[in-house]
Structures are given as structure tokens and as C-alpha cells.
UniProtKB/Swiss-Prot annotation:
<feature type="binding site">
    <location>
        <position position="246"/>
    </location>
    <ligand>
        <name>a divalent metal cation 2</name>
    </ligand>
</feature>
<dbReference type="InterPro" id="IPR004843">
    <property type="entry name" value="Calcineurin-like_PHP_ApaH"/>
</dbReference>
<keyword id="KW-0378">Hydrolase</keyword>
<feature type="transmembrane region" description="Helical">
    <location>
        <begin position="87"/>
        <end position="107"/>
    </location>
</feature>
<dbReference type="InterPro" id="IPR051158">
    <property type="entry name" value="Metallophosphoesterase_sf"/>
</dbReference>
<feature type="binding site">
    <location>
        <position position="384"/>
    </location>
    <ligand>
        <name>a divalent metal cation 1</name>
    </ligand>
</feature>
<protein>
    <recommendedName>
        <fullName>Transmembrane protein with metallophosphoesterase domain</fullName>
        <ecNumber>3.1.-.-</ecNumber>
    </recommendedName>
</protein>
<keyword id="KW-1133">Transmembrane helix</keyword>
<dbReference type="GO" id="GO:0016020">
    <property type="term" value="C:membrane"/>
</dbReference>
<keyword id="KW-0812">Transmembrane</keyword>
<keyword id="KW-0472">Membrane</keyword>
<feature type="transmembrane region" description="Helical">
    <location>
        <begin position="7"/>
        <end position="27"/>
    </location>
</feature>
<dbReference type="GO" id="GO:0016787">
    <property type="term" value="F:hydrolase activity"/>
</dbReference>
<feature type="binding site">
    <location>
        <position position="246"/>
    </location>
    <ligand>
        <name>a divalent metal cation 1</name>
    </ligand>
</feature>
<dbReference type="InterPro" id="IPR029052">
    <property type="entry name" value="Metallo-depent_PP-like"/>
</dbReference>
<feature type="binding site">
    <location>
        <position position="216"/>
    </location>
    <ligand>
        <name>a divalent metal cation 1</name>
    </ligand>
</feature>
<dbReference type="Pfam" id="PF00149">
    <property type="entry name" value="Metallophos"/>
</dbReference>
Length: 444
């Protein structure tokens, strides 16, 4: 205990994160079978929220020191304005930390105001933390260059420099947050992409597939947005509509009314769905499958359907194979009965007919092409095109395909949707939500 008290606050936060992470492993490995399923599911989601908050605490310490602690020796430190400023920063950080708990306790048909405010603060937290780190790095680089050149570092006194940093951070964070909020509030753009498909039957030339992904029904996305997406899709008059995962962030029973507009989708040859990683975080996939099927949305659980120009499941010569795999996160989580199984998903698909694969993560698309390079087209999501800066950089570096259309080989393409809505944070910076209209064109 004495050793723990001697640790810095940052070290304590890191230790807490490690402890919660170990408890998550124990919960997944040893408690999943002994606890009642609903109790275990709540426990695991609470552990996940605690783990994320433990990591966030490191950033919160840095923000607090940069915007409050470093100013305690300034002439204004005893003023009423500074005391008010401390309360504002504390409330801002508390709201940002509360955001992940709203995913457990505050999810309904429409978002609660508190959830929207909390996730907005989380977005501002990410922007501010990044800006402060970049600003600090620039200061250190300038000081190093000045020292190596044998020059004085600058004329500003230390107090003024310490006050300038939080002022700049607040201004930049406010401007970027407003821009991000306004951008995310816009309806998704409708993007039309023509994809050449080898061996596409003439009767299926110009087949229209509408792609949705990463809607993330939950604390900040509700029925109103879902209804808007459905109306936009219906105006496109799709032949096929596909939803490539991360539809939800809570249990089916909680979001039943929010997802109900999906039942109004009008797709001539059917609507299909594959799981994303967030479906497995809800630990409620079987109930989601049942709910979606009641809405005429067919889950492709490592399986495929044959689609012809006149209807699905036909045995004639003019058809394409539409296959879907479970998200690879199911393999990592050891989710019973689930996991990416490409061989099973493509069973019955013919090399003489085009194959289109639905796989939520671009990493799954890469693995699928390594195993089966004869797949014509893979449709993915997951990246959100980064959603907000600086997460764009991380999403680009961590995924083999980032956003848009990629030609992997002469007859093989991958399309990654930037997402139809957003995850949690109701902002988009450097990205735009999208509904994708893919037009299949016959290729030699």
C-alpha cells in the first residue's frame, strides 16, 4: 500500500487500466459460463467502460495540468474567474469520462440530451488532447533548434507562455468541435461508384447495390436518423441493400423501436446484414439476428445466397454469389458459435459466377483475398474514414484499406464505406458520412 501511495497519478491510472484489463480476461475466460448471461454481459460492458476510462485518465491528467495546474502561480490564480475556469474544466472532463457509461445506462429509442453532451465533450477532449500534445511537441522542437543554434529561446516570460497554451487549445477545440458537429448533423452524402465485375451475367448488368455501414444505433443515434437513412435508401430504388456491421451498440430489446424503420426498406432482391465488432460487444447477437429477420433483413452468418436478376435464391445460370462472414472480433472474443469462417461462407459459390463478400473489417477483407483471390468484390466498413482528426491518422495506419474503392487485382476490388452515421461522438472532421450506391458493370 505504501508503494502504491508513492506512485504518480499517471502510474496509478495505468495500473488501474491494467487491472481492469486482466479482470476482463478473467470474466471472459472463467465467469462467462458460471454467471447468468445477462449479468455477465452487463459486467463485461461495465469492465470495458472502466478500462477505457482508466486510459482516458492519463489524458485528463495532462489536460488538467496544461490548462489549470500550470497556471496556479499566475497573478490571476486567486481570482473568481480562475476558480470558475477550474470548475468548467473539471465538469468538461467528468462529462467526457461519463460518455462510455451512457452506452450502458442511457440508451433508448432516441438519444438522451445528457448522452449527446457527454459524447460531444469526449470529441472535444480528443481534439484538445491532440492539440496540446502537438503544441508541446512544437515548443520542445523549437527550443531544441534554438539551443543548437546558440540563440535565446524567446522573449515571452514563462507565465504568459503557460497562459497562452490553454487559450489557444480552447479556441482551436471550440472551432473544430463546432465544425465537426455541423458536419455530422448533415445527412450522409450519396456516393455512386461503378465497379467492373468479371463474369457478371448480362441480365445483371447495372445491378444496384446500396451499402450501409457503421450506423451505431445507441446513445447518440436513434430512430429519427434511422428513419432518414431508410428514406434515402428507398429513393435510390436499390436492387440489393447490404449492411456491413456495427448497426448497434446495445441490446436488441433496448433498441427494438429505434431499428424498426429497417422494416420499411424496399430492396427488390433483398436486404442483407453481417456482424461488426460492436454487435459482439453487445453480447446479444442471437437476439439481433431474430429481430433483423422479423424486419426482412437477412443475416449472412458465414453463409451465402444466390441472387439472380429476377429474384434471390434462384438456381438458373444468371446469378451472383453474395456471401457474408462474421466479424473477426468474434474469434478474438471466443464468442460461442461465431467467428470468421470464409470456407463455410463461400461453400457453394462457383468460380464461374461472380462472388461478392460482405466483411465488416478491412483486415478481414485482406485475409479473405489472401485465401481466395478469386473473390470479385468485398464490401467493408469499420474505419469511419477516421471520423475525426486525429483518429483519421490512426485508422489509416491500422487498416490495410482505409476508405473508398481499391483495385487489388485485375478482377478484384475492395470498397470500404466511411460509415453511414458515426460512433458515439456526434462529430466528423476530415470525413463525411456516406450512403454508397454501387453499380455493377459487366467486365471482360
Amino acid at each position: 500500500m505504501a508503494i502504491f501511495r508513492q506512485l504518480s497519478l499517471g502510474a496509478k491510472a495505468a495500473l488501474a487500466a491494467g487491472t481492469v484489463f486482466v479482470s476482463m480476461i478473467v470474466s471472459r475466460s472463467y465467469l462467462a459460463e458460471s454467471l447468468e448471461f445477462r449479468a455477465w454481459r452487463c459486467l463485461f460492458r461495465l469492465q470495458l467502460a472502466l478500462f477505457v476510462n482508466s486510459l482516458m485518465l492519463l489524458g485528463s491528467i495532462y489536460i488538467w495540468r496544461s490548462t489549470v495546474s500550470n497556471l496556479r502561480h499566475s497573478p490571476a490564480a486567486e481570482s473568481a474567474c480562475f476558480q470558475l475556469w477550474k470548475m468548467v474544466v473539471a465538469a468538461f472532463l467528468a462529462l467526457a469520462h461519463s460518455s462510455f457509461f451512457t452506452m450502458i445506462f442511457l440508451v433508448a429509442e432516441e438519444p438522451y440530451l445528457f448522452s449527446l453532451v457527454a459524447y460531444t465533450c469526449l470529441g472535444a477532449y480528443v481534439i484538445m488532447l491532440c492539440f496540446l500534445c502537438v503544441l508541446s511537441g512544437m515548443e520542445q522542437a523549437y527550443q531544441l533548434l534554438a539551443w543548437r543554434a546558440g540563440r535565446a529561446v524567446g522573449s515571452l516570460d514563462k507565465t504568459r507562455k503557460l497562459a497562452l497554451r490553454p487559450a489557444l487549445a480552447v479556441m482551436v477545440t471550440t472551432v473544430l468541435s463546432v465544425v465537426g458537429l455541423l458536419n455530422a448533423a448533415q445527412p450522409p452524402a450519396v456516393t455512386t461508384v461503378e465497379v467492373p465485375v468479371h463474369r457478371l451475367p448480362p441480365s445483371m448488368n447495372s445491378l444496384k447495390i446500396v451499402l450501409l455501414s457503421d450506423i451505431h444505433l445507441g446513445p447518440t443515434v436513434g430512430r429519427t436518423k434511422m428513419d432518414m437513412f431508410v428514406r434515402m435508401v428507398n429513393t435510390l430504388e436499390p436492387d440489393v441493400t447490404v449492411i456491413v456491421g456495427d448497426l448497434c451498440d446495445s441490446e436488441a430489446s433496448v433498441l427494438r423501436t429505434a431499428v424498426a424503420p429497417l422494416g420499411q426498406l424496399r430492396s427488390r432482391l433483398g436486404t442483407y446484414f453481417v456482424t461488426g465488432n460492436h454487435e459482439y460487444y453487445t453480447s446479444d447477437v442471437s437476439n439481433w439476428f431474430a429481430l433483423l429477420m422479423s424486419l426482412n433483413v437477412q443475416p449472412l452468418h458465414n453463409e451465402n445466397v444466390r441472387i439472380s436478376a429476377t429474384g434471390a435464391h434462384r438456381e438458373d445460370d444468371d446469378w451472383i454469389c453474395l456471401a457474408g462472414v462474421d466479424d473477426i472480433e468474434a474469434n478474438i472474443l471466443h464468442y460461442t458459435g461465431h467467428g470468421m469462417d470464409l470456407e463455410k461462407a463461400l461453400e457453394g459459390c462457383s468460380p464461374d459466377h461472380p462472388t461478392i463478400l460482405l466483411a465488416h473489417q478491412p483486415l478481414a477483407a485482406k485475409r479473405a483475398l489472401q485465401a481466395r483471390p478469386d473473390i470479385n468484390l468485398i464490401l467493408s466498413g469499420h474505419t469511419h474514414a477516421g471520423q475525426i482528426f486525429p483518429l483519421n491518422v490512426a485508422a489509416y495506419l491500422l487498416n490495410p484499406f482505409f476508405a473508398g474503392l481499391y483495385q487489388v487485382a485485375e478482377t478484384t476490388f475492395v470498397y470500404v464505406s466511411p460509415g453511414t452515421a458515426y460512433y458515439g461522438i456526434p462529430m466528423r472532421l476530415g470525413s463525411r458520412a456516406e450512403i454508397t450506391q454501387l453499380i455493377l458493370q459487366a467486365a471482360p
